Amino acid sequence: MTSVKRLAEICGGTLTGPWQGVEVTSAAIGSRDVQPGGLFCAVPGQKVHGATFAADSNAVAVLTDAAGQRIIEDAPTPLPCIVVDDVREWMGPVSAEIYGHPARQLKTIGITGTSGKTTTSYLVEKALLDSGLKVGLIGTTGTRINGKPIPTSLTTPEAPTLQALLARMVAEGATHLVMEVSSHALQLGRVRGLHFDVAAFTNLSQDHLDFHPTMEDYFQAKALLFERAEDGQQPGTAVICCEDEWGERMRDIAAQFSSTVALYPQTKNDSAERPEANTNPAWAITSAEVSASGRQHIGVEITGAESSRKLNYSIGMAGAFNQANSLVALACIEAVTGETLTSESPAVQALADVQVPGRMQLVEAGQDFLAMVDYAHKPGAVQAVLSSLHDYLPDPQARIGIVLGAGGNRDHEKRPIMGRIAAELADAVFVTDDNPRDEEPSTIREAIYAGAREGVLKKKKQQQDKETVCEIVPDRAEAIAAAVSWAQSGDAVVIAGKGHEKGQLVAGVMHPFDDVEELANALAQRAQAHSEREGRQSESSEQR
């Protein structure tokens, strides 16, 4: 237990109400989540202040601001309050104190970037587990402790939930933590009070401009993982993917605070200038080959101040961007373990078998074309997936179809951009619903479709158009079926946007929906229809 007096000392807060002798055993940001004996972190809401619900919670004390304190003071039974200017700024350090600073007992890796966080974290988790270590994972697809799933919601949980999870991981024997760190989490202070031994940056492309007013603001939010000057929590080692100007800028920022490992994933047409060997190592992909089965065989050169070495490994996932993800993963593993990796290391060998739900996930039902589900829901990710498919398909005449939507109540500007990219790189675009949330679905579809039509016109001007199909199919299951019906032998179909998700959020209601299941159903129905046609043709032939 921790006294509220001690917590007030940590955050420099003012104590009000009957605080003497009060101790807390847990913390929560949701009033309904407060356990008996817990601290309620009451923050201002969009409509009402969280402190309004303090009296109905199990809280024995409240961390809040001046506005929240006034609400609690006027309640029939006032609770002890720790009053601070910014509750979110102090939730992390206070929660860490309550739970005994569990992160100090873990080797921690934090991964940020627009795309690739989930795949990279999966790769790191598998490699560490195969090396005989106990590992906790927190990210978009959920939380796991030593491979066992633990229900969570946000990519990066709120600080009280996060610290409770870390304490549970330590209690269950975990020694290492692999964690996705979103820009929201950094901006809202969810990881304050948590030191990362290794912090990694994958890439930056347009997304979340509903939350960040500009790309520069988005970049600066990501950079907080490496600066974090407000609480002296800079990472021990920074791993930076330097494939463009964003990566180069992040490398320069990180180098001011941490030992920095620069990564260069592009094997050709490099836009990033590779520095000469210095005291900081640089990892560069020197070769990448795709086998007939789709497995990628990758060669890496690692250079330092006085020497260089080579590393060869395989991954079972398609896409040039997964080459980059694997490079980030290996650099993180070497940094956190202190082991000099070789091609024979268990951690390196482990990457060959990793499959990530909803990330370039192949769905096979005996069809003669490629069918996959991917989480791509932002312009950069859509471009990366479609470009990778062009490189992946053996027949240059093979066609690519994409089912595409966009989330409601999110960045509006990216919708036509996604549509345009899809039409420029694919041969068929089936515009449909993603998670409309509280928006009118047709408005979202029309924005994507407008961009797609722009892409088609651009291809026609360049005389590149092969009669691109561009259709609006509102029902997502029907759109998936339409794409499957369109595909011919040797083609590829990708269902983009929802990936691992198991539901579709429409007007505040979550409806069961799984892209992988729907794609499998559509493939089965196509196979059945084909079988029935063959049966009728055979029957007709016999009658003649």
Question: How would you label these PLM feature ranges?
Answer:
Residues 1-93, 97, 314, 318-320, ...:
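N-terminal leader/targeting and accessory segments in enzymes
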Residues 8, 90-259, 330, 536:
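Phosphate-binding loop of NTP-binding sites
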Residues 45-47, 183-184, 206-207, 244-245, ...:
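Short glycine-rich anion-binding loops that position phosphate/pyrophosphate groups of nucleotides
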Residues 45-48, 356, 380, 388-460, ...:
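Active-site beta-alpha connecting loops in nucleotide-dependent enzymes
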Residues 60, 197, 427:
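Receiver (REC) domain switch/active-site residues of two-component response regulators
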Residues 81-86, 471-474, 479:
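Short acidic-hydrophobic, aromatic-tinged amphipathic segments that line or gate anion-handling sites
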Residues 209, 511-544:
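Short, flexible loop segments at boundaries between secondary-structure elements
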